[in-house]
């Protein structure tokens, strides 16, 4: 906190700003630091409009944000929160929200938009100008195109580009003249938006590399892990709330199969045992001659009235598939 001895040395507006930042930092459970250094004013306003209802964005001086973070950490007895100040960089700003870090990152990433490249900037990729009409009438722009190495000529009363041309390769510096031409052609090779520096949640600070994940791959891994754990629980007979029903069903089916195979009669297996014995009798009778059989058995064999063998149903796989779908149910909440 700013003490009384030093207050007279600090501009009142700075004290008010730090206090306002502290209120913001205490207002939500999720606090993010974002970099908005390279975001033009027009794009920044568009982004603000997109995220206004989901989070609060506040810009300030890095020194004041650092002080506010450290004071909140001290006042709340939370030294882990103070580490968030280590992520202050460039043109940082604070976002306060209740949105979980992964969903916050996705929302900010989706709010990014294409923008023209600035002169003196490094090309983020190979920048190519496509052949075709520019839609512009003959004039000075024709000379500007040629000056930056773009083959152009008048075609049907309009300035046209003769062929596809890579005007700057990834990693090269874009000249001011080329930047002006690309902007005039409506080419926007740069993606601008709010980049995450660090997100604090419940004692943990996430960086962009932590939050930038392939959702389908991530969910697939969780589903695979769940399936493996489910099968291990069933096969090792380690009951859980998710597997107890399948374990009991598997045990019942295994016991029933043993009972039938060993001819150990129970009220659950009597029919299956008798059916199996009957089928075996008919099979043996079929190998014997008619002289060895009585008339009733011969009649049954000729009519094909052999009783079907009842087999113990195997249901655990069906149940496994039913259970496997469960882990995906709540994963959407992360994103």
Curated annotation (Swiss-Prot):
The keyword Amino-acid biosynthesis does not apply. Residues 304-335 are annotated as: Disordered. InterPro entries: Ribosomal_protein_uL10, Ribosomal_uL10, Ribosomal_uL10-like_insert, Ribosomal_uL10-like_insert_sf, Ribosomal_uL10-like_sf, Ribosomal_uL10_arc. One of its GO terms (cellular component) is cytosolic large ribosomal subunit. The keyword Magnesium does not apply. Keywords: Ribonucleoprotein, Ribosomal protein, RNA-binding, rRNA-binding. Pfam families: Ribosomal_L10, RL10P_insert. GO terms for molecular function: large ribosomal subunit rRNA binding; structural constituent of ribosome. GO terms for biological process: cytoplasmic translation; ribosomal large subunit assembly. Residues 314-325 have a biased composition (Basic and acidic residues). It comes from the Archaea. Forms part of the ribosomal stalk, playing a central role in the interaction of the ribosome with GTP-bound translation factors. Part of the 50S ribosomal subunit. Forms part of the ribosomal stalk which helps the ribosome interact with GTP-bound translation factors. Forms a heptameric L10(L12)2(L12)2(L12)2 complex, where L10 forms an elongated spine to which the L12 dimers bind in a sequential fashion. Belongs to the universal ribosomal protein uL10 family. This is Large ribosomal subunit protein uL10. It comes from Methanococcus maripaludis (strain C7 / ATCC BAA-1331). The gene is rpl10.
């Amino acid at each position: 906190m700013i003490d009384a001895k030093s207050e007279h040395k600090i501009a009142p507006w700075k004290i008010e700003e730090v206090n306002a930042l502290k209120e913001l930092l205490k207002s939500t459970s999720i606090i993010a630091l974002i970099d908005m250094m390279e975001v033009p004013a027009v794009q920044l306003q568009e982004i603000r409009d997109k995220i206004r209802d989901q989070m609060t964005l506040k810009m300030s001086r890095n020194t004041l944000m650092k002080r506010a973070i450290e004071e909140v950490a001290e006042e709340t007895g939370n030294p882990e929160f103070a580490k968030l100040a280590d992520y202050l960089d460039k043109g940082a700003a604070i976002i306060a929200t209740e949105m979980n870090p992964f969903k916050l990152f996705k929302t900010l990433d989706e709010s990014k938009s294409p923008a023209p490249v600035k002169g003196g900037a490094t090309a983020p990729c190979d920048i190519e100008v496509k052949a075709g009409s520019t839609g512009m009438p003959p004039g000075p722009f024709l000379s500007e195109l040629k000056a930056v190495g773009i083959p152009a000529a008048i075609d049907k009363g309009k300035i046209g580009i003769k062929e596809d041309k890579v005007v700057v390769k990834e990693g090269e510096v874009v000249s001011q003249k080329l930047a002006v031409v690309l902007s005039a052609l409506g080419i926007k090779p740069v993606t601008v938006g709010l980049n995450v520096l660090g997100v604090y949640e419940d004692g943990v600070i996430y960086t962009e590399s932590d939050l930038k994940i392939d959702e389908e791959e991530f969910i697939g891994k969780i589903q695979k892990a769940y399936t493996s754990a489910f099968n291990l629980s069933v096969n090792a007979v380690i009951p859980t709330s998710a597997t107890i029903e399948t374990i009991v069903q598997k045990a019942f089916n295994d016991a029933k199969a043993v009972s039938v195979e060993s001819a150990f009669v129970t009220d659950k297996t009597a029919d299956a045992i008798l059916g199996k014995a009957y089928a075996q009798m008919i099979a043996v009778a079929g190998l014997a001659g008619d002289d060895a059989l009585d008339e009733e058995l011969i009649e049954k064999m000729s009519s094909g009235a052999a009783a079907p063998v009842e087999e113990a149903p195997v249901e655990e796989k069906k149940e496994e598939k039913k259970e496997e779908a469960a882990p995906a149910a709540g994963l959407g909440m992360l994103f």
